[in-house]
């Protein structure tokens, strides 16, 4: 899932940091948004080491969240799945697509007490320390808070296949023309010129504007969650 290269990371990060794009979203969410939010949402943000995409489904008091981290250069793609019942975290499941791959699964009971834990690396099962579990819980809290802010701030993730006329066929089958800056379009076109297939793009839309998130040869739509399957 590595996407940005050839120096494309720096302009993206500088633009986001200069405009305080995510900070603006956090401030907007802090002010509160009382209009009804859809139960299934997709969002994301730019991190220091890579892009994060978040899918979330809210049903009654339950929250199901999937976070996908894609590194800019070095590092491994990681998926993190979480479930909450009310405010209580009930599941953490992590997959790191490294060599060898790593899988972590942690469950908590209705009282928030640990009920199951396991780490598996290259087929070898291991136990987790209390410090490791505490770190995973902390990360779960952080991604939940970030997701809350992005959701309230109306930051929407869109993905699809890029076409030569600067339009995208999204994973939902819509044809859109993202309102991206010229440097972002130039970057996509450079990537496309080195690919024999139409590249996939992911971008974010919000009241503050649109930002390119990822470009890759991989078909993002092949594995993207949907409201029915998530």
Short names for language-model regions:
Residues 36-92, 96-154:
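Extended, compositionally biased repeat/scaffold regions that form elongated interaction surfaces
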Residues 148-169:
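Structural detector for short beta-strands of small beta-barrel domains
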Residues 206-230:
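OB-fold/S1-family single-stranded nucleic acid-binding modules
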Residues 2-21:
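Bacterial N-terminal signal peptides that target proteins for export
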Residues 32-34:
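Bacterial signal peptide processing site
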Residues 27-30:
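C-terminal motif of bacterial Sec signal peptides marking the signal peptidase cleavage site
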Residues 174-191:
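Beta-strand/loop nucleic-acid-binding surfaces
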Residues 191-211:
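Flexible glycine-rich surface loops and low-complexity tracts that mediate binding to linear polymers
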């Amino acid at each position: 899932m590595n996407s940005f290269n050839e120096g494309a990371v720096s302009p993206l990060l500088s633009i986001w940091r200069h405009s305080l794009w995510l900070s603006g979203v956090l401030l907007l969410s802090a002010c509160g948004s009382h209009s009804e939010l859809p139960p299934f949402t997709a969002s994301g943000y730019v991190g220091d080491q890579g892009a994060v995409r978040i899918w979330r489904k809210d049903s009654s008091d339950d929250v199901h969240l999937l976070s996908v981290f894609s590194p800019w250069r070095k590092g491994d793609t990681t998926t993190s799945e979480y479930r909450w019942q009310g405010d209580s975290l009930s599941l953490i499941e992590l997959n790191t697509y490294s060599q060898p791959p790593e899988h972590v699964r942690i469950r908590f009971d209705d009282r928030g007490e640990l009920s199951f834990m396991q780490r598996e690396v290259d087929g070898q099962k291991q136990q987790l320390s209390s410090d490791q579990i505490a770190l995973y819980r902390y990360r779960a809290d952080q991604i939940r808070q970030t997701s809350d802010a992005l959701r309230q701030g109306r930051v929407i993730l869109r993905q699809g296949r890029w076409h030569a006329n600067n339009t995208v066929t999204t994973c939902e089958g819509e044809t859109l023309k993202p309102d991206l800056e010229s440097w972002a379009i130039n970057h996509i076109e450079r990537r496309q010129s080195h690919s024999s297939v139409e590249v996939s793009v992911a971008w974010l839309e919000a009241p503050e504007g649109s930002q390119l998130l990822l470009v890759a040869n991989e078909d993002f739509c092949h594995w993207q969650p949907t409201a029915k399957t998530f």
